[in-house]
């Protein structure tokens, strides 16, 4: 790309890591402790939050216009093997201050583990920034079964009292009207496992807005799918007698969002019974589409 008298060279992204490469990188002998220079400064809040968490995969195919995860980690999912994940769980249980609780079995989006193209040659030719917007690609395998199986294996570990999912769940992947890949019931199986065993009081999801016009610019699905997800979530919670509120995240001031849209957001979320605590005001982030709109 010419810039005046100079030429800017942009290297292509590195290829997606294979499972064996992921396992090697995570199997290195990490101390799982902060850098020694912080020893005299007392507890580090950010470290305390994630010290007993397990990162199961890298990458995100959501392609949200305000997000840089795909630029940093890639659009394609690089997943660790079950053996590597369980090895890390075992390491965590040996920590002297471990009390039996894993804070997160997750990734950039909690529920994209092992998801990839059925025919990866089609993916190699694809230039779309998202695999799930405006619709889910027919070539994308979105089965939640491998993830459900790992949750259950971790649950059965004798030293684990509870393993929570602290990463954000991509809820639209679990709505049958949006994601048709539920012929074997993998959505329902995953949702029951998640809601009954892995929610630490409340579940975080990110519809981001209620205005479909704004959501299209964000590359997010229509808010009607959040209604469908909430209905399913409430039904499963009621079935098992659980009171675990949904916590939806929203963005204000996003490009394409008008004051009227924010007024409607306030009214619609109030009608749904939400008392919003967390609304992020849009911050232009380098390397995002939303930054340059």
Question: How would you describe each model-predicted region?
Answer:
Residues 1-14, 18, 260, 272-276, ...:
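C-terminal accessory regions of radical SAM enzymes
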Residues 1-50:
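Flexible, acidic/Gly-rich N-terminal and inter-domain linker regions that tether
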Residues 6-8, 39, 49-55, 65-76, ...:
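Glycine- and acidic
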Residues 25, 60, 64, 85, ...:
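Conserved, mostly hydrophobic/aromatic
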Residues 39-68, 86, 101, 283:
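N-terminal pre-triad scaffold of radical SAM enzymes
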Residues 53-65, 76-84, 88, 92, ...:
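Cysteine-centered iron-sulfur cluster-binding motifs in ferredoxin-type domains/subunits
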Residues 91-247, 251-255:
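Conserved SAM/AdoMet-binding glycine-rich loop
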Residues 254-270:
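Catalytic cores of alpha/beta
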